[in-house]
């Protein structure tokens, strides 16, 4: 920890030194990265498009209300006339939209520059701010937002060389930018680590936690200030995919520790638990967490990655992270791309990016600015945002460049949201929404599909539907094959780039047990030390429809982390885990999620607070038999004849569900007991009351050679939802058979569990 603090302090000192040091040479100049402002005010740090435009930038995301100024101080070494250059863009100019919504000013020592910024340029470039007279010494600079509609600023350059603009700065840490920042030619080294995980979403967190608990020294690199990816408070997609089930029901226990419990998507900030996720990661002594670090290239030795270079998105400094194994959990497959891993990307028809949003209603009327630059929408052009939120289907970019034009896709989504809210406030929806306000719009996009890195197995839709078995099948994928397409109803007005989607759910996935995704989808087939987890794993476009949801991605990470520990012990490649150490991996997958060891070769410790082992269908949602008195047999173990339907709608059922059927159908449910010791026992049925249940449900009890018939009332609410059938005096090893029938019933017959309870 001390080393990390000192390292960060040194980088900060160097950056401030180059801003405040006296200027030398024939040309005086000052370069200020917007992200390094001492006070950002209401401006957001946007790191999503560094690969496309070269840098993080500040974004005035105020939902139509100007944000507070960003403020910093800088030093001028000599008085004089300086030309002001600002790297920015007019973010709607590419669509020939009018009014330039992203306007802002530069104010130096209380005086605004002559130019208004955010009004020029389809692409990122230098906007000439004119000549400014500056005095030697400390000066104050402010970014003043004028609109609240996503003005953006990358950097500011002041120079006494007034004739030429600075060079382009589209590449990450270009030579010119390095020179201005005073960065050393060789970055600071971190590591070596057993595993370097790039990407702090569910896949990355699962990989890091799993590897660390199996004794690996891990670096977790995340380009945002929070963890969770699409499942963070910045994007607010609730985490889906059933966990703790299938062949290895211990997989998912780690993800359960960090999962949200959001009631909506998008939900509230608090529901997504950013602080919880960070705390769980930081509590692991084997993990070094690098938030606000954007990986931008790799070093290679043949087919092996030796290091990842990452940019500190707050200071512009760079670190080189050295490791033995690397896990690409970036979603877009960036690490694999730079390493020249085999990959695939559907040329069109991909799933898009969503920017969800929320609104509310106050007690008094509110105003919202007209948005002539947004999409030109009326209320019929979009689905009404019910329950005050715009959901996952606010999605676009299906046939657009999901990598090279990700910023354009995000911006199109913003134009759609603002255009829709403008319709609600200022057009044909105005009469019904006088008090409506925008409360939240995601400026961080939630992408679904781009590159997929190829492994030794490329999983297909046919594999999943046919339930093809692989010896290394492990991660249970329980989401349907869910692919998104433009929704025809709303696609006509903007046919080139529809902004509302529909989900088409395929069949064939067992959503209770899950399809076991093979381990060989989680490592590169041509980069020797590269794992992957998340939506960039080795699957086809169609198969991605089931594996891409976040809890499933997190479970991939759990498998990757354990495989990395086997690689560390045996000094082998990820492929060797399948070919030579598969039994070791499958053994580790049976460990509780909280099992841990200090090093990959140390003894494994299972703590007392480990979760109980779930069954193949996952943790029971109802009452656990182990917590009930007596001998309880659930309907899972009963013998049924006829047609029965499983249900979970009535509370207080035992384990997974109950079953029900209609009267007089000749259907039966039979429960067989062997008495463990002699005594008098009450025979009882667990039965959740409902007005449509039978009051005359027939029950037959067979004991030795005797057969007795009873009738129970399942409509009447009973204590603890248990209905008594009869009492019997029983000998040890007696057999008791209880059959619930339908003949003569006057309502729905309900079958849950049956119990023998010894009467003291």
What are these regions (language model features)?
Residues 189-201:
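Beta1/beta-strand and adjacent pyrophosphate-binding region of the FAD-binding site
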Residues 210, 216-217, 222-301, 351-354, ...:
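Conserved N-terminal/central alpha/beta ligand/cofactor-binding core
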Residues 182-189, 230, 307, 317-622:
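Flavin (FAD/FMN)-binding glycine-rich loop and adjacent Rossmann-like elements that form
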Residues 11-22:
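Bacterial N-terminal signal peptides
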Residues 27-188, 620-760:
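Extracytoplasmic
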Residues 1-10:
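N-terminal secretory signal peptides that target proteins for export/translocation
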Residues 204:
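N-terminal Rossmann-fold NAD(P) dinucleotide-binding loop
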Residues 299-319:
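Conserved beta-strand-loop-beta-strand element in the redox core of flavoprotein oxidoreductases
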């Amino acid at each position: 920890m001390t080393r990390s603090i000192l390292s960060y302090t040194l980088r900060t000192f160097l950056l401030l030194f180059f801003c405040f040091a006296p200027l030398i040479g024939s040309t005086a100049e000052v370069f200020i990265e917007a992200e390094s402002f001492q006070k950002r005010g209401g401006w957001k740090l946007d790191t999503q498009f560094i690969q496309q435009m070269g840098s993080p930038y500040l974004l005035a995301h105020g939902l139509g209300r100007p944000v507070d100024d960003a403020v910093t101080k800088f030093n001028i070494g000599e008085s004089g006339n300086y030309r002001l250059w600002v790297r920015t863009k007019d973010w709607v100019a590419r669509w020939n939209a009018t009014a330039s919504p992203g306007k802002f000013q530069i104010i130096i020592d209380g005086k605004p520059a002559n130019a208004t910024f955010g009004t020029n340029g389809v692409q990122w470039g230098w906007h000439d701010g004119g000549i400014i007279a500056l005095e030697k010494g400390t000066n104050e600079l402010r970014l003043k937002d004028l609109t609240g509609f996503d003005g953006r600023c990358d950097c500011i350059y002041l120079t006494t060389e007034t004739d030429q603009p600075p060079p382009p700065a589209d590449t990450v840490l270009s030579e010119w930018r390095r020179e201005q920042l005073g960065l050393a030619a060789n970055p600071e080294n971190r590591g070596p680590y057993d595993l370097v995980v790039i990407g702090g979403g569910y896949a990355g967190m699962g990989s890091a936690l799993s590897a660390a608990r199996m004794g690996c020294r891990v670096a977790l690199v995340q380009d945002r200030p929070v963890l969770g990816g699409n499942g963070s408070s910045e994007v607010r997609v609730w985490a889906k995919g059933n966990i703790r089930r299938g062949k290895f029901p211990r997989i998912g226990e780690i993800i359960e520790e960090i999962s949200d419990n959001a009631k909506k998507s998008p939900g509230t900030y608090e529901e997504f638990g950013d602080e919880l996720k960070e705390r769980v990661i930081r509590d692991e002594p084997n993990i070094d967490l690098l938030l606000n670090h954007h990986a931008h290239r790799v070093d290679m030795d043949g087919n092996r990655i030796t290091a990842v270079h990452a940019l500190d998105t707050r200071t512009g400094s760079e670190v080189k992270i050295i490791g033995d194994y690397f896990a690409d959990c970036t979603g877009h497959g960036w690490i694999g791309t730079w390493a020249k891993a085999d990959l695939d990307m559907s040329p069109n028809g991909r799933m898009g990016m969503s920017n969800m949003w929320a609104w509310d209603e106050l007690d008094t009327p509110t105003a919202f600015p007209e948005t002539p630059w947004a999409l030109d929408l009326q209320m019929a052009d979009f689905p009404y945002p019910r329950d005050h939120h715009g959901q996952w289907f606010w999605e676009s970019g299906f046939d657009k460049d999901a990598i090279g034009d990700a910023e354009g896709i995000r911006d199109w989504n913003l134009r759609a949201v603002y255009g829709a809210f403008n319709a609600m406030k200022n057009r044909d929806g105005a009469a019904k929404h006088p008090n409506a306000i925008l409360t939240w719009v995601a400026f961080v996009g939630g992408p679904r599909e781009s590159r997929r890195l190829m492994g030794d197995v490329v999983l297909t839709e046919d594999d999943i539907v046919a339930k093809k078995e692989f010896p290394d099948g492990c991660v249970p994928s329980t989401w349907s094959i869910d692919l998104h397409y433009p929704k025809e109803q709303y696609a006509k007005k903007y046919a080139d780039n529809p902004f509302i989607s529909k989900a088409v759910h395929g069949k064939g996935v067992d959503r209770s047990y899950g399809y076991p995704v093979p381990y060989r989808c989680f490592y590169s087939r041509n980069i020797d030390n590269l794992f992957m987890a998340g939506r960039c794993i080795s699957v086809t476009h169609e198969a991605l429809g089931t594996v891409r949801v976040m809890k499933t991605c997190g479970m991939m990470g759990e498998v990757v982390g354990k495989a990395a520990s086997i690689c560390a012990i045996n000094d082998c490649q990820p492929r060797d885990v399948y070919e030579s150490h598969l039994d070791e991996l499958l053994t580790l997958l049976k460990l509780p999620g909280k099992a841990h060891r200090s090093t990959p070769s140390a003894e494994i410790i299972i703590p007392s607070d480990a979760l109980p082992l779930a069954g193949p269908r996952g943790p029971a949602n109802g009452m656990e038999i182990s917590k009930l008195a007596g001998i309880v047999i659930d309907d899972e173990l009963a013998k049924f004849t006829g047609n029965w339907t499983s249900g979970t709608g009535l509370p207080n059922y035992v384990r997974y569900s109950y079953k029900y059927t209609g009267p007089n159908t000749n259907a039966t449910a039979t429960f067989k007991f062997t008495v463990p010791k002699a005594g008098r026992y009450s025979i009882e049925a667990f039965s959740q009351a409902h007005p449509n249940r039978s009051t005359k449900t027939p029950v037959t009890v067979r004991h030795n050679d005797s057969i007795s018939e009873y009738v129970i009332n399942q409509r009447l609410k009973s204590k603890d939802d248990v209905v008594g059938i009869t009492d019997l005096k029983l000998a040890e090893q007696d057999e008791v058979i209880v059959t619930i029938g339908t003949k003569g019933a006057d309502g729905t017959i309900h079958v849950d569990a049956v119990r023998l309870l010894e009467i003291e």
